């Protein structure tokens, strides 16, 4: 039988037999509650005093699977456990404070989330003790206020607003229980995850690349492209706007540059984006092209039989250490994920055109009529007269334009795609679908 002994300031549970004598129960209480037998008065949950030490629990009707008795000390009032001075209490508090001081990760979290406790820990034992007492007082006040609100809400069971508040309170209690369960059984879920970076070389220049399988394209910043000496290969026909949660300007595309991963030298294409928070983002296009495997069990990026280790936290670039991972990922991933589709000759960025009327060489106007006649005749001899550049829609076959329109591209974008691909419909279609 499970016997619960409820004292004024504590609760004790014991597995006992119903045939146990009351005297034995008194001895148990004496040992657990540290009270002399003369001041111990036991009462059953039915209010029956257990005064005869020679009788058993069963004789008082306490013979079920569980039973409860109440302990009521007599004589001089007994101080509660919270008011009894324990000589080891300060030592325990100091031990707790020193443990916190010896945990740099905990101290960093306290500095950001609870500066008051952080200052109390650094202020010494008494300061930390006052902070603990204040926290306990706040907890008691919060429990009291919670109970008061529950009583106020239960005062009118037909009040719809009160019932909604009760429902929300129940929901929040479930949320807190779920959080406490997670903190107890999976505390690692509350830690920060180190983003995946690797050491690479672009055109012989060392770069720390961010590996992101959620980004559609591989991205490089203009500054990094300049440092690597590949900005001269930028194809501005692929300029546009990348739109996700935010927007970023696509300067163009570098179709092929040499990148070194481990001992492998591989070709890699880059989209050049302004305002990115990383120098190089290794996206899904290159991961799939080179059949890379992100192996988190070995913390490596595996390409065939070559393994490139991911960088540890202290090796990350300064940008990644200074900024939160969620902020970095949010700024990079969305624009990268839609970079190609939104960035191929996007009409949002005006395309640079030749600053003239499109006349052939030698057909420009002049001040003298003789010069104009001579120029026109000379031009006519070479080109058959004034030759205007055909409009973009006349340069390409109508069937090719219609093919791209049928695939979902507006007519203007279809013409731009054909210009970017040199009239190759298959290449233009691949650009359309990223």
Swiss-Prot record:
Disulfide bonds: none
MF annotations from Gene Ontology: aspartic-type endopeptidase activity
Catalytic-site annotation from UniProt: 212
Swiss-Prot/TrEMBL GO biological process terms: protein transport; proteolysis
SUPFAM superfamilies per UniProt: Acid proteases, UBA-like, Ubiquitin-like
Subunit composition and interactions: Binds ubiquitin and polyubiquitinated proteins.
Function: Probable aspartic protease. May be involved in the regulation of exocytosis. Acts as a linker between the 19S proteasome and polyubiquitinated proteins via UBA domain interactions with ubiquitin for their subsequent degradation. Required for S-phase checkpoint control.
Name of protein: DNA damage-inducible protein 1
Lineage: Eukaryota, Fungi, Dikarya, Basidiomycota, Agaricomycotina
């Amino acid at each position: 039988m499970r016997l619960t002994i409820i004292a004024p300031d504590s609760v004790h549970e014991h597995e006992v037999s119903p045939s146990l004598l009351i005297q034995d129960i008194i001895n148990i209480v004496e040992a657990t509650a540290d009270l002399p037998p003369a001041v111990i008065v036991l009462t059953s949950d039915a209010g029956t005093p257990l005064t005869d030490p020679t009788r058993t629990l069963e004789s008082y009707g306490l013979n079920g699977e569980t039973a409860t008795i109440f302990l009521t000390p007599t004589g001089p009032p007994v101080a509660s456990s919270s008011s009894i001075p324990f000589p080891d209490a300060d030592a325990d508090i100091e031990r707790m404070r020193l443990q916190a001081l010896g945990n740099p990760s905990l101290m960093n979290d306290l500095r950001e989330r609870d500066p008051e406790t952080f200052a109390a820990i650094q202020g010494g034992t008494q300061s930390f003790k006052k902070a603990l007492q204040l926290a306990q007082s706040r907890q008691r006040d919060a429990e009291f206020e919670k109970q008061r609100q529950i009583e106020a809400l239960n005062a009118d069971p037909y009040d719809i607003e009160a019932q909604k508040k009760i429902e929300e309170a129940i929901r929040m209690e479930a949320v807190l229980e779920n959080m406490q369960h997670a903190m107890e059984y999976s505390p690692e879920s509350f830690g920060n995850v180190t983003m995946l970076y690797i050491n690479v070389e672009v055109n012989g220049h060392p770069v720390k690349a961010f590996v992101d399988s959620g980004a559609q394209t591989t991205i490089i910043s203009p500054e990094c492209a300049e440092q690597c000496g590949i900005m001269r290969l930028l194809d501005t026909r692929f300029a546009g706007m990348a739109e996700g949660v935010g927007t970023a300007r696509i300067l163009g595309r570098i179709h092929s540059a040499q990148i070194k991963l481990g001992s492998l030298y591989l070709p890699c294409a880059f989209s050049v984006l302004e305002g990115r928070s990383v120098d190089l983002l290794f996206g899904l296009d290159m991961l799939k092209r080179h059949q890379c495997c992100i192996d988190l069990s070995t913390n490596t990026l595996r390409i065939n039989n070559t393994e490139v280790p991911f960088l540890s936290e202290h090796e990350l670039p300064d940008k990644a250490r200074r900024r939160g991972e969620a902020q970095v990922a949010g700024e990079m991933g969305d624009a990268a994920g839609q970079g190609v589709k939104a960035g191929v000759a996007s009409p949002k960025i005006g395309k640079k055109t030749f600053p003239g009327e499109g006349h052939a060489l030698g057909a420009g106007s002049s001040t003298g009529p003789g010069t104009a006649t001579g120029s026109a005749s000379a031009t006519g001899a070479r080109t058959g007269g004034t030759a205007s550049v055909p409009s973009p829609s006349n340069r390409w076959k109508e069937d090719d334009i219609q093919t791209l329109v049928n695939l979902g591209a507006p007519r203007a974008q279809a013409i731009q795609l054909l210009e970017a691909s040199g009239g190759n419909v298959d290449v233009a279609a691949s650009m359309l679908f990223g």
